[in-house]
Regions:
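A short, internal acetyl-CoA/4′-phosphopantetheine-binding micro-motif in the GNAT/acyltransferase core
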Residues: 69-76, 105-106
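Short amphipathic alpha-helix that is part of the acyltransferase structural core
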Residues: 1-27, 45, 142-144, 148
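Conserved beta-strand in the GNAT
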Residues: 43, 49-58, 63-70
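A short helix-loop-beta-strand connector motif used in the catalytic cores of GNAT acetyltransferases and
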Residues: 33-47, 65, 138-141
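Conserved acetyl-CoA-binding loop-helix of GNAT-fold acetyltransferases
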Residues: 77-90, 102
Length: 149
């Protein structure tokens, strides 16, 4: 079941995100990062356990980002990630956000969700705020993908 994250979900979200960060797939987050962004997070809960998360971040009036997309080991390849993305896209549509992007290593996954690969330079510079915290800021190897609502 996909649902809005609650404060009780913060430890599980933190674990999911930071486990993926240890694999070099995303940036680490502090508990404060998660608490401050809890309203942006959705989770997938199965059998009382949070097994996936994602957040939709509105960056400007015309663009948002799907970030912190993570699914627990043992639950991958079950469609959970796709459902999290679809839920973020429905929210974007509902609030009138025309474009959503992500920076990812999982281009095939995002292509299957309807995203198209774009040149990172085609994105407005304001979308790269989190990149300043990344050790790969000067040699980013993630691919930019975008979805037009």
């Amino acid at each position: 079941m996909i649902r809005q994250a609650t404060l009780n979900d913060v430890p599980a979200i933190l674990s999911l995100v930071n486990n993926h960060a240890k694999q070099g797939l995303m940036l680490t987050k502090s508990p404060l990062d998660i608490y401050r962004n809890i309203l942006n997070f959705i989770v997938c809960e199965q059998d009382g356990q949070v097994v996936g998360c994602a957040r939709l971040v509105v960056l400007w009036k015309d663009i948002g980002e799907i970030a912190s997309l993570a699914v627990a080991d043992g639950y991958k390849r079950r469609g959970i990630g796709a459902e999290l993305v679809k839920t973020c896209l429905r929210t974007a549509r509902k609030i009138g956000l025309p474009r959503v992007f992500s920076l990812t290593y999982q281009t095939a996954f995002f292509n299957a969700c309807g995203f198209k690969i774009v040149d990172r330079e085609s994105l407005p510079h304001k979308v790269f705020g989190d990149c300043l915290k990344c050790p790969k800021v000067d040699c980013c190897d993630e691919t930019a993908v975008i979805y037009d609502i």
